[in-house]
Amino acid sequence: MFWDEVNMKCLSVSQPYADLIVKGKKTIELRTWNTKFRGEFLVHAPLKIKKNVCIKMDVDETKLRTGVIVGKAEIYDVKVYNSVAELKSDYKKHFASEEFLHHKYGFLLKNPKELRIPIPYKGSLGFFNVDLKTSVKANEIKTELFDEEYRYQWIGKH
């Protein structure tokens, strides 16, 4: 389980897309490259914000967190897109603008989780490793995730 992990994969995703992923609104992350990786990963929001996307989607960019790990999600499969029409048909799952319709691979996501306390971290290209043991506030973050996930298991079950 997540709270037992100390070293996790992480992927930088520009804002507002990072927030959309951890809130469960964006379920496909488009990339130009494929991956064999399946499982939980951390979602990192780099410093750059896609302002044109914020305007288009009516997102207040001043409320977006950057330079931090904002949550986690799970990749359970990769969809290969063979045409722009296919990409456009999944728009409500990836929200990519026209400039990204050349991206051929869609990482299919599930089980998103937003952190209430983001972890300050410098991003990198592609998947990179994050050692939670040495991260700032790691114990608090792991405890928070454990508490939230434990509580979630019991909602509506008493």
What is the predicted role of each segment?
Residues 2-158:
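Structured alpha/beta reader/binder surfaces that contact nucleic acids or chromatin modification marks
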